[in-house]
Amino acid sequence: MNLFSALSLDTLVLLAIILVLLYRYGTCTHGLFKKQGIPGPKPLPFLGTVLNYYKGLWKFDMECYEKYGKTWGLFDGQIPLFVITDPETIKNVLVKECFSVFTNRQDFFPVGIMSKSISLAKDEEWKRYRALLSPTFTSGNLKEMFPVIEQYGDILVKYLRQEAEKGKPVAVKDVLGAYSMDVIISTTFGVNIDSLNNPEDPFVENAKKVLRFDYFDPLSLSVALFPFLTPIYEMLNICMFPKDSIEFFKKFVDRMTENRLDSKQKHRVDFIYLMMEAYNKSKDKDSHKALSEIEITAQSIIFIFAGYETTSSILSFTVYSLATHPDIQKKLQEEIDEALPNKAPPTYDTVMAMEYLDMVLNETLRLYPITNRLQRVCKKDVEINGIYIPKGSTVIIPSYVLHHDPQHWPEPEEFQPERFSKENKGSIDPYVYLPFGNGPRNCIGMRFALMNMKLALIKVLQNFSFQPCKETQIPLKLSRELLLQPVKPIVLKVVPRDAVITGA
């Protein structure tokens, strides 16, 4: 009996020691912000502050900004997140100290071959990709892609006309998402698809599988809580991206590169062709060695991942904003009609020269920054503007907060394209307007994305006006998704411009 009691006591002591050690491990970094006097929500052991993300990143960040001010601290598990909103500090992180300290993005999950993509690559590997890929987005290459994108604009118009003739309202994200998917796949892989009418196309199915992501997926959450698991997952070939879809695109890239290397014929310009050509045009062939087929596959998939959701969502938010502001919609249509009389086909130069279209799109990007946040990992201990940031920490720049701050934007919740007029845009601080980031690691595909969206808007607004209907949610409520989305799908009435326009 005494032995049993002794063993029980030893067991209890051992359990107590284990629990104390676990608690200390799960909270070992949680005193960092308190030491510096940086406010923030109280973290939980192991979890940190991640449970607050259930509110939606944009909403949680707004609550923190209102409660704590310009700088606050969060924890993804045990990883400290320094959230900054001061423009000068943001400039230091994104530009001045980009190469020396804040080069890389945060690892959210094991990514497999996608670590070879420009968005997820690190340090010298990222610099090499950037040097090789930047020339693919020149205005000359975009002009060559323009007719390909325009043909999908025509398909979009044809589909919307059919829907308008039925007299039924349209779920715009479904339609504009199909347009975005067609453009991304066609300009990346040189393949013509029609996902509006062929949603079971294997390219479409595999692309959509790649796009599925949930921060609270057990795999993502386990990495947030226990970062040391990432290399273990990588060794075990466990990846957030579906293996069958990765293999589908890899096989296609392999076939494509073989065919093009064997053929002497001139090929249609697409991103895979341009990536193959990038090495031949590189001035520094020693450091900028050619992209391997794995690397080309990774870039191709990241183009889909980065381009589809952002383009379709921004276009959806834009037509919603136009439908709920008919005076702005009319003014934009007048600019389009003046530049392109009698529904003349647009040209690259005409599209990029439209000032009011640019203003409307910029204001949509301000109101609805799809990614909510920018983030950079600190590579070494550093002090910026009085804030000590230790190696391994992450700096968060809350784009949504900056874009909705009344200190920078009077009446920030109002849709006012005039903010970006010639007279006004010079007064905008470039570090409080960050739809595509800033600095050397900004969005490499920004010019392509803007051209794509502008062309789609011109095509549809030449032919239609958008109106609210009884299914339209006004005001628009945003969901808790990781990427900015409405709670309910945006549904609008599409009215051909040669028809009589009536009230909703």
From Swiss-Prot:
Cytochromes P450 are a group of heme-thiolate monooxygenases. In liver microsomes, this enzyme is involved in an NADPH-dependent electron transport pathway. It oxidizes a variety of structurally unrelated compounds, including steroids, fatty acids, and xenobiotics. PROSITE patterns: CYTOCHROME_P450. Its main location: endoplasmic reticulum. Keywords: Endoplasmic reticulum, Heme, Iron, Membrane, Metal-binding, Microsome, Monooxygenase, Oxidoreductase. It comes from Mus musculus. PANTHER family: CYTOCHROME P450 3A-RELATED, CYTOCHROME P450 FAMILY 3. Its EC number is 1.14.14.1. It catalyses: an organic molecule + reduced [NADPH--hemoprotein reductase] + O2 = an alcohol + oxidized [NADPH--hemoprotein reductase] + H2O + H(+). It is a peripheral membrane protein. The keyword Metal-binding applies. Induction: P450 can be induced to high levels in liver and other tissues by various foreign compounds, including drugs, pesticides, and carcinogens. CDD domains: CYP3A. Belongs to the cytochrome P450 family. InterPro entries: Cyt_P450, Cyt_P450_CS, Cyt_P450_E_CYP3A, Cyt_P450_E_grp-II, Cyt_P450_sf, Cytochrome_P450_3A. It is an enzyme of class 1 (oxidoreductase). GO terms for cellular component: endoplasmic reticulum membrane. GO terms for molecular function: heme binding; iron ion binding; oxidoreductase activity, acting on paired donors, with incorporation or reduction of molecular oxygen, reduced flavin or flavoprotein as one donor, and incorporation of one atom of oxygen. The gene is Cyp3a16. It is found in: Endoplasmic reticulum membrane; Microsome membrane. This is Cytochrome P450 3A16.
